[in-house]
Amino acid sequence: MISFSDGNIHDIDHFVRVWNYAKTIAELEEIDPETPLILEVAAITHDIACPLCREKYGNTNGKHQEEEGVPLVKAFLSDSGMTEAQIERVAFLVGHHHTFEEIDGLDWQILIEADYIANATENGYSKCCHSC
């Protein structure tokens, strides 16, 4: 993914943050044994379409990321050794990581939360109760 990101430090930092948050949340939730692999791969690849979206649309709008990311992540993972079902679930998560309705699994919920926390941190959001 680092090569795929064309060395964009923001993108690399972001997907590593999302992966770290997702991994931590999953460990604390004690989820089933197969889900962490799918979740962690989805966390690392969730913004796989950002370079393409910047080039094609001039921005990284979430809906564009979801649409463009599915075929990219399927191709990226095609020789990874993951099963077709695992790749399909990762692709589904990449294709829905900006969709907050009808969340159908803990992997999707955790990915949404991890991405939100990373975005909030990167954008300086805070719920500070005292003067900083």
Model-based region annotation:
Residues 84-91:
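Active-site-proximal substrate-binding core of FAD-dependent oxidoreductases
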Residues 18, 63-79:
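An active-site-proximal "capping" alpha-helix that borders the catalytic cofactor pocket
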